[in-house]
Amino acid sequence: MKKNLSIIILLFSIMLQVAAAAGQEAVVVQSARFAPYEEALKGFQSVCRSDITRIVISELERNDVVERINKINPDVIIAIGMDALTKVKTIKDTPIVYLMILNPRSIISGEKNISGVSMHIPHERQLLVLSKVLPHVKRVGLVYDPDQTGYFMERARETAASMGIELIANEVHSSRDAPSSIKDLEGKIDAFWMIPDTTVITPETVEFLLIFSLENKTPILTFSEKYVELGALISICTDPLDMGSQAGEMANRILSEKDYAYVERTDARKEIIYINLKIAKNLGITIDDELLAGARIIK
């Protein structure tokens, strides 16, 4: 009897949420039809129960996104990517849910109407994956700008030490200094940790780092599949499709509860590991079959 009552209550709750979402509208804003953004949109569409209107900024004749949104007067705004969030964050009277953004804190702070899912993967998780793929690594190099990623680096250093790994971090304040700081790590490290620091990650620095990796047989852990395709050994990154689903769940809560102040900002709940087997072979690294089975392989 109690079990049947629980089922009835659950079904009634779902019916109320669906009814609440009926006739409501979500506006999705994205800068362009970029493949990961399209995946995120698919995930969102699969979960969100409201009507959905999409605005692609690059396809607008006039670049006044806010004016277009105000004409639609949606119940919730979905910002896919940093450019989209930058455009819509001035809107204060409509809830905004962001996704596909690495560091939302860089452009938002205490706005009560903005919540979302960041692409941040905790440093603990990244170090754990690194230690499983490369169990003999004891010294990991890192180059960072303290104004960009200083807090991340300090926390990562503490975690690495607790795992028996020494984090050797060189500080830079200009992109011009990044290559020489990487060069300074030669002979001192077993692997390099490439973090999403906008001061460090430039096309010139990435090219230098990839050459450094091959010349010194130093594997790179990075944050994006594209760098694994270019020559890094491994990346741990978010799943755009699942992030879209996560954002859709947030939007549903906002639309049904009518109180977006209680929908907290959070991190992506699922990641994907990419491994470049050609690079592993070139560096003389053998990776456990069990780890390979759970990763996406780039040959």
Please place each PLM-identified region on the residue numbering.
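Positively charged n-region of N-terminal signal peptides that target proteins for export
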Residues: 1-7
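Bacterial N-terminal signal peptides
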Residues: 7-17
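Short hydrophobic alpha-helices and adjacent helix-cap/hinge residues
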Residues: 21-299
